[in-house]
From Swiss-Prot:
Cellular component GO terms held in the UniProt record: cytosol
The species this protein was found in: Paraburkholderia phymatum (strain DSM 17167 / CIP 108236 / LMG 21445 / STM815) (Burkholderia phymatum)
Protein name: Glutamate--tRNA ligase
EC identifiers of the protein: 6.1.1.17
Motif residue range(s): 'HIGH' region: 11-21
UniProt-listed HAMAP family: Glu_tRNA_synth_type1
Gene3D superfamilies, per database record: 1.10.10.350, Glutamate-tRNA synthetase, class I, anticodon-binding domain 1, HUPs
GO molecular function, one term: tRNA binding
């Protein structure tokens, strides 16, 4: 019987969560769903000084927005301290750890001497018990750290799903501190206990954790466990080629929602930011689950491309249900001072969204372009002077009369425009541009008949008549 796949996302709630961070949730989530396995959420909050409830909320909110549902958790490391102490006690009883009284100052001085002589700076095992070795006398009043007895010989090796075979000599590794002087366990120890207890089979995480992996494998084996499959993801770079970070201008995950991106577009883009399925650029959440595998994870850093994300978001906006987009648009209208009562009194919002969405990269852009339907026109003086000329006023007057009488449909409005053009021997731009300026306050709109139909007969006629009276 095969072991069920169990993956995890284990963020530290110490601030900002950007696309590079949340990708480390997407891939294990997709792999668990593909494998009909279990996806676990674990909050690694042992850094008490930097961990905040606000950061936890940002992680949960970002995952929920993208639809990354978890099966177990969230588990909080700070709530598992009794379990860590229990394992530490077992390790002490088994001789797997030992107390070390070397002070920070002594350790710094040791490393300086090692650097000066061309050695790799590392703890030298001063307090490590060995047969026949006489240990220094513990200093009075000093609480020791606990160090793990790392094997002195041999090799730690694993077949990384991204990096291939990785081998590290144990001689390269010193004895890791796994408990601080106050007894609190350290990160690398907690991770191992959690992965063992939660029966994690696949660890899919950023390659900044590669250096931790041999140490974690040795602790895992000392506790009688077998290492999971590791897949260390290359870094996500920003558009300037730097590692994505808040310091280098990365946007938070929820910042994309607030800028008008759809979650399905961000999910699709994020999936392609380090994984591929042939030449497929656009795929649904269901297709991602069907296709996802570890074999096609990229081996090189992935670079964020904002234009590509905009292209994808435009695709999903065009495909999206108009009523859903109308609901999503309301906060963006509110930011422009257009409240819901104003929207209700103006042109039908769902119809406006349907007309305006195709050219927009974000919901915010849809709203910016659609705001004209809910505001009084405020055309630029140059546009008025250029397009609303004395020569065209007679045609505008006739058009207003024709629009009063025509059937108020796209076809009826188009017929009124065509008749006016014919009577005054004008070309469409000569009439359509002044009408756009007078009715919408701008020269940039979709087809004039569609726009006028949504504004409504009374608004259109009154705005044209004001200019020709």
């Amino acid at each position: 019987m095969t072991t069920p796949v169990r993956t995890r996302f284990a963020p530290s709630p110490t601030g900002f969560i950007h696309l590079g961070n949340i990708r480390s949730a997407l891939y294990p989530w997709a792999f668990a769903r593909k494998s009909k396995g279990v996806f676990v959420l674990r909050i690694e909050d042992t850094d008490v000084e930097r961990s905040t409830e606000q950061s936890v909320d940002a992680i949960l909110e970002g995952m929920q927005w993208l639809g990354l549902d978890y099966d177990e958790g969230p588990f909080y490391q700070m709530q598992r301290m009794d379990r860590y102490r229990e394992v530490l006690k077992h390790m002490q009883e088994q001789g797997l750890v030992y107390p070390c009284y070397m002070s920070t100052e002594e350790l710094d001085a040791l490393r300086e001497r090692q650097r000066a002589s061309g050695e790799k700076p590392r703890y030298d095992g001063t307090w490590r018990p060995e047969p026949g070795k006489v240990l220094p006398t513990p200093p009075a009043g000093v609480q020791p750290v606990l160090r793990f007895r790392n094997p002195l010989t041999g090799v730690v090796a694993w077949d990384d799903a991204v990096k291939g075979r990785v081998e590290i000599s144990n001689e390269e590794l010193d004895d890791l501190v796994i408990a601080r002087p106050d007894g609190t366990p350290t990160y690398n120890f907690c991770v191992v206990v959690d992965d063992l207890d939660m029966k994690i089979t696949h660890v899919i995480r950023g390659d900044d954790h590669v250096n931790n992996t041999p140490r974690q494998i040795n602790i895992l084996r000392a506790l009688g466990g077998e290492p999971p499959v590791y897949a260390h993801l290359p870094t996500v770079l920003n558009e300037q080629g730097e590692k994505m970070s808040k310091r280098h201008g990365a946007m938070s995950v929820m910042g994309y929602r607030d800028a008008g991106y759809l979650p399905e577009a961000v999910l699709n883009y994020l999936a392609r930011l380090g994984w591929s399925h042939g030449d497929a650029e656009i795929f649904s959440r269901e297709q991602l689950i069907e296709w996802f595998d570890l074999e096609h994870l990229g081996k090189s850093p992935a670079q964020y491309d904002h234009n590509k994300l905009n292209w994808l978001n435009n695709h999903y906006i065009k495909e999206a249900d108009n009523a859903r987009l109308a609901d999503l648009s309301k906060p963006f209208f509110a930011a422009l001072g257009i409240d819901e009562p104003t929207l209700a009194k103006g042109a039908d919002l769902v119809s406006v969204i349907a007309l305006m969405k195709d050219r927009a990269s974000t919901v915010k852009e849809v709203v910016d372009n659609a705001a004209m339907f809910y505001r009084e026109p405020n055309p630029d003086a140059d546009a008025l002077a250029q397009h609303v000329t004395d020569a065209v006023r007679p045609a505008l007057a006739d058009l207003a009369a024709a629009l009063k009488a025509c059937e108020w449909t796209k076809e009826g409005i188009a017929a009124a425009l065509k008749a006016t053009l014919g009577a005054h021997k004008l070309k469409m731009p000569q009439l359509a541009m002044p009408v756009r300026v007078l009715v919408a306050g701008t020269t940039h709109t979709p087809s004039i008949d569609s726009v006028l139909m949504l504004f409504g007969r009374d608004v259109v006629v009154s705005r044209i008549e004001k200019a020709v009276v």
